[in-house]
Each structure stands twice: as structure tokens, then as C-alpha cells.
Amino acid sequence: MESMPSSLTHQRFGLLNKHLTRTGNTREGRMHTPPVLGFQAIMSNVTVLDNIEPLDFEMDLKTPYPVSFQVSLTGFLMLEIVLGLSSNLTVLALYCMKSNLVSSVSNIVTMNLHVLDVLVCVGCIPLTIVVVLLPLEGNNALICCFHEACVSFASVATAANVLAITLDRYDISVRPANRVLTMGRAVALLGSIWALSFFSFLVPFIEEGFFSQAGNERNQTEAEEPSNEYYTELGLYYHLLAQIPIFFFTAVVMLVTYYKILQALNIRIGTRFHSVPKKKPRKKKTISMTSTQPESTDASQSSAGRNAPLGMRTSVSVIIALRRAVKRHRERRERQKRVFRMSLLIISTFLLCWTPITVLNTVILSVGPSNFTVRLRLGFLVMAYGTTIFHPLLYAFTRQKFQKVLKSKMKKRVVSVVEADPMPNNVVIHNSWIDPKRNKKVTFEETEVRQKCLSSEDVE
């Protein structure tokens, strides 16, 4: 198809040259054929055939990202919406059902984080899906600016809430008797966090100029331009100057605070696993020494005669006390291991999810945005939204009080299902959660008494 127009142009150029040479040789041709007309005829013939490139540009505007990129990001974002909403709403429902869970300061701070995760799942993640699937033709500057505002809100609010939970845990571990973070101070801290988050939400709109008349006039004049220029202008990324310091400040405070918490619990990070096998033979020696003590006391008591019961009592009490001490030491070591693992999980999850997008924001501010950095930023944003799934697992489902409440609710649910749907033919199903021993004893004793009564009547 491309060879045919080129051949036609060559033929037309040949005919024009022949015509110009013929008319140029005569006097009439020299007088009546100026060179401007020949140049205009040539240019008109050349420009008639160039009508293909604008169509390709419009096709590129309709598909801003590859289809595989759109499908993968949309799938991950939908999964985060489903898992994040289900887990966070479950946690909030259980917190609201039990009044004793809301009474403490640490639970209120944790609930604030779960409320934020619900808002991110409802507002921020769906808007990211719209931006990924949105064609760039038309004026989409308002949607893009709103998306940047949601990203700014999510990053600042998440970092601030994680920082508040870290300070609360430090206050519990280091100063359990006289706590600094009281209920009134906690409410003031949460209020300041929400105010800071709302201000970070407004910064992209102020930056774009939607609240001023000049900004509105500029948006009306730039309505015909493609909206991909929104993401490639450096002046629209200055709101990242507030997100980057908050992230690094939160990361440093988390590292220092959890190190202090481990020190308060006498947990050494380097020699924690090497100190356990050294103490075990000492425990065995003490146990063996205590086991030899009752033998010697038994020998002395057998020789003593009347003093035997008193010596046996003292030896048994010593053995019981030593067993309790060993059990307490083991529980303490298990508690320390659990705290150490949870601290590592909390720190690593926050850093793994939010470090890539923060580093990329720093690169954008230093070098400038491009199409590649815009796509990479959307991928890192999916990683950052993964905290909506990890927060309930790290801060709620690992707590013992929350686990007890969840188990009790599940028990009541199972009991109601068993009572509402009885089996036919009077078949009794014993539930393992509803004291099976007590029910079995009662039924067994009743049948045994009936058999005895029947046997006694037969004998009589």
C-alpha cells in the first residue's frame, strides 16, 4: 500500500518537470509560468498523501499502558480490596462488640489504624484502578490530581499511625507503671494525625491551583492537551517533600524504639539463641541436685523415724518450687521470642511496603518524572497498599485478648448453629467446645441408674 502512493508521486513529478521544460523553452512559457506556481503545485501534490501519523497518535492515547500491565495491577488491587476490607471490618466489628477492648489506650490507637485501612480500601485503591484503566484522551487532570491527593493522604496517615502505635508499645514495655500516653493525650495525638493527613490530602490541589481563579482559567485553556502531561510535569510533585521526611522519620523511630523494647525485656539480638543451650545443663544440674536431695532426706528420715513426714513435705515443696521456676523461665523465654519475632515482622513489613515508592519519589524529585517512572510508581503503589492486609494480622490477630474474644464468638456461633439445626431421629451430636465430659458423665449416670432400677425391680 505504501509503494503505490510513492509511484504516483514520482509520475506526477515527472509530468510536472516535462511541462515546465516545454513551457520554459517558448517565449509564452517564460512570460506566463512563474516559478511560484510550479512550487505550489509540487507542495500540494506532496502534502496530499500525509494523513497517517495523527491516527497512530490517537491510538496511543487510547491505550496509555500495555494490557498485561493493566490486568496484573488491576488483579492485585482487587485482591487487596477484598482481603483488606474483610480483615479490617472483622477487627473493627469485634472491637465494637466488646466494650473492654475499647477501654485501653493501645486498642484505640490500633482501631484508628484499621479505620484508616478501611478508608484506603474504599477510596484510594479504587481510584488507582480507575487511573490505570483510564484512557488519556480528554481532560482528566482533576481525576489525576484527586488520585495524587489520595496517595499523599494514605502515605502520610499510615506512617503517622504506625509511629503512634510504636510509641504506645514503647510506653507499655518501658514504663508500665506510670504511662505517659494517657487517654486524653492519645485522643489529642490521634486528632493531630487526622489533621496532618487531611492537610496532606489538600496539598496536591493547592499545588495544581484548583482553588484559585487563575488555576481554573489555566485548566480551561489546557483542556485540549492530553492529560499524560500531568504526570510528566515536575511542578506537580512538590507535595512529595512532605511524604519523604515523614517516612524516614517513622522508620528511624521504629528501629530505635523496638531496640529499646527488646533491651527492656532483656533480649539480646546477637546472642539470644546462643545463651539458651548454655543454661540448659545448669537447669539439669539443679534438677539432678534437687532429685538427689530427697533421696538423702529420705535416708535420713528413715533413720530418724518420727521426723520422716516433715522432711518429705519439705523435699516435695522444694521440687514443686523448682518446677514452677523452670516453667516460669521457659514461659518468659517464649514470650521474649514472640516479642522479638513480632518486632522484626512489624519493622520489615513497613519497610518492605513503603521503602520502594519513597525511594522512587526521591528520584523523581531529583531527576524528574518520565513515562517509565510513572509506570514504576504505580507498581510500587500496589506494594504500599499491601499494608492494608498485613496490619490486621500484625496488630490485631496476634493479641491474646483479641484471640479470646474471637474464639468466644466462634463458639457461640457454632452452638447456635447446632441448636437451630437438630439432626433427625433424635441423634445427639456432642460438640467438643461445649464441655463434652460433663455431658457424657450426666448421660452415663442417668442410663446406669435406670439399668440398676430395672434390675432391682426384676429381682423383686
Curated annotation (Swiss-Prot):
InterPro entries: GPCR_Rhodpsn, GPCR_Rhodpsn_7TM. It comes from the Eukaryota. Keywords: Cell membrane, Cilium biogenesis/degradation, G-protein coupled receptor, Membrane, Receptor, Transducer, Transmembrane, Transmembrane helix. Residues 276-286 have a biased composition (Basic residues). Its main location: membrane. GO terms for cellular component: plasma membrane. It holds the Pfam family 7tm_1. The keyword Membrane applies. Residues 276-309 are annotated as: Disordered. The chain crosses the membrane at residues 75-95, 115-135, 145-165, 186-206, 236-256, 344-364, 378-398. Residues 96-114, 166-185, 257-343, 399-460 are extracellular. One of its GO terms (molecular function) is G protein-coupled receptor activity. Disruption phenotype: Morpholino knockdown of the protein leads to defective left-right (LR) axis formation in the embryo. Cilia number and length are reduced in the Kupffer's vesicle (KV). Morpholino knockdown of the protein in Kupffer's vesicle alone is still able to generate the phenotype, indicating that Gpr22 regulates LR asymmetry through the KV. Residues 287-305 have a biased composition (Polar residues). CDD domains: 7tm_classA_rhodopsin-like (cd00637). Residues 1-74, 136-144, 207-235, 365-377 are cytoplasmic. It is found in: Cell membrane. The keyword DNA damage does not apply. Orphan G-protein coupled receptor that regulates cilia length and structure in the Kupffer's vesicle leading to the left-right asymmetry development by establishing a directional fluid flow. Belongs to the G-protein coupled receptor 1 family. This is G-protein coupled receptor 22. The gene is gpr22a.
